[in-house]
Amino acid sequence: MLIEILLLAGAYLLGSIPTGLLLAKAAGVDIRTTGSGNIGATNVYRTLGRSVGIATLVGDCLKGLIPVLAAKYLGMTDLWIALAGLAAFLGHVYTVFLGFKGGKGVATALGVFLGLAPLAVLIALGIFVAVVATSRYISLGSITAAAAMPPVVAFLSGRPPLVGVTVVIALLVIWKHRENIQRLRAGTENRFKA
């Protein structure tokens, strides 16, 4: 049990590393005061360009993937594997390093799900791409893909710990997008420009 607790603590701390903030600071920008003010890959991309945005996406994704792979490598049960992913995700959205104010969690959730349910990620990614291609709203694509994950994971795996954690992560991703939802409804949300 000690190893599992240490893994969860490590996963949370890894998830708490504010990748976008650190990369933006290295470029001389405080991302929290630029664009949307969010520390995630979309705002970094819009503010600092493709390369820094992609680096943020990859870094945030790895924060979710590494703890899941570590738990699998250590031979932990589905419950602990799923909790390791959840801990990393919670670290990102409620980072201890920024007063528990983090990002929206999309990229970190992607990493978690790549480790937990890679086939479900492919389906959700297809949904994300279709929504963004037709609407040009990254936020709408993220919300729709998050909403699709629980039923897809339930259908493909049916394993209660994975489904439970997927529901929690999906709900939190949608909750973290509540301001985007308001802007979408008001017609003031920023569209994606490639």
Curated annotation (Swiss-Prot):
It holds the Pfam family G3P_acyltransf. It is a multi-pass membrane protein. Its EC number is 2.3.1.275. It comes from the Bacteria. Its main location: membrane. GO terms for molecular function: acyl-phosphate glycerol-3-phosphate acyltransferase activity. Keywords: Cell inner membrane, Cell membrane, Lipid biosynthesis, Lipid metabolism, Membrane, Phospholipid biosynthesis, Phospholipid metabolism, Transferase, Transmembrane, Transmembrane helix. GO terms for biological process: phospholipid biosynthetic process. It is an enzyme of class 2 (transferase). It is found in: Cell inner membrane. The keyword Cell inner membrane applies. InterPro entries: G3P_acylTferase_PlsY. GO terms for cellular component: plasma membrane. Catalyzes the transfer of an acyl group from acyl-phosphate (acyl-PO(4)) to glycerol-3-phosphate (G3P) to form lysophosphatidic acid (LPA). This enzyme utilizes acyl-phosphate as fatty acyl donor, but not acyl-CoA or acyl-ACP. HAMAP family: PlsY. NCBIfam families: glycerol-3-phosphate 1-O-acyltransferase PlsY. Probably interacts with PlsX. Belongs to the PlsY family. This is Glycerol-3-phosphate acyltransferase. It comes from Geobacter metallireducens (strain ATCC 53774 / DSM 7210 / GS-15).
